[in-house]
């Protein structure tokens, strides 16, 4: 049994899995990307903008890893800098101003931990997102599509509904990092993965997420159509809820 959680981690990290921009391209129409945080730069690890979902205007934000080595390098392997989180927050506040629901796709091993990111306020940027997301007056759905690593994932996951693909993972630390800290041996990553309760089934049983999304036909039109339909149905329901902020605040 201990082998199963770590196998899920390997699947979640697979280069062939659909990335954030794949979901944007195949689920939404008329996507217009916005760039920059208006403070420092444009972080390529986070893609965001406005689009339409079956005619509904939405703001969509995704942490993007890329598929090829060149794409992954360009996207910093899906590890956002502070300016990425600030860009995401700028888009969220804009969505709130214009009454647009927000959809986030999360796939990151964690926020970038380089010295330059720390100098530009990585911790503050993540904390600010978490704080501001609790008070957004529009519906928010966050979907973990691959890796959900620590605060780097949580900074886009303070939502009314949090979903996971069945082979996605969500954890405070990577199995390798946990094994290195607890046992000084990264080779015990499998044992660490089992202890971390990082699978979608674990997250649902603990009340961290509401729904596990089947990966049947993943990457095909039928898969994206199904995910898009579920998002639209949920947004329609959430849009009728007059107590979103209070419920979200109580949850987190």
Where are these regions (language model features)?
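Terminal-region recognition feature
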Residues: 1-180, 184-187, 194-251
């Amino acid at each position: 049994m201990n082998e199963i959680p770590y196998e899920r981690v390997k699947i979640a990290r697979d280069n062939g899995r659909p990335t954030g921009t794949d979901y944007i391209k195949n689920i939404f129409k008329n996507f217009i990307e916005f760039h920059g945080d208006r403070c420092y730069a444009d972080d390529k690890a986070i893609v965001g903008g406005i689009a339409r979902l079956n005619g509904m205007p939405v703001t969509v934000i995704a942490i993007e890893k890329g598929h090829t080595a060149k794409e992954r390098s360009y996207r910093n392997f899906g590890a956002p800098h502070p300016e990425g989180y600030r860009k995401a927050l700028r888009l969220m506040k804009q969505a709130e101003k214009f009454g647009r629901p927000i959809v986030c796709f999360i796939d990151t091993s964690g926020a970038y931990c380089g010295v330059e990111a720390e100098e530009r306020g990585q911790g503050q940027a993540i904390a600010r997102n978490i704080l501001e997301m609790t008070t957004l007056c529009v519906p928010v759905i966050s979907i973990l599509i691959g890796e959900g690593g620590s605060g780097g994932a949580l900074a886009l996951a303070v939502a009314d509904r949090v979903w996971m693909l069945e082979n996605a993972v969500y954890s405070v630390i990577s199995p390798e990092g946990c094994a290195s800290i607890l046992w000084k041996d990264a080779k015990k990553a499998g044992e660490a993965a089992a202890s971390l309760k990082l699978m979608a089934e674990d997250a649902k049983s603990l009340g961290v997420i509401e729904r596990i999304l089947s990966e049947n036909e993943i990457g095909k039109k039928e898969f994206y159509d199904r995910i898009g339909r579920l998002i639209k149905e949920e947004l329609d329901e959430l849009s009728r809820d007059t107590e979103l902020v209070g419920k979200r605040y109580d949850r987190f």
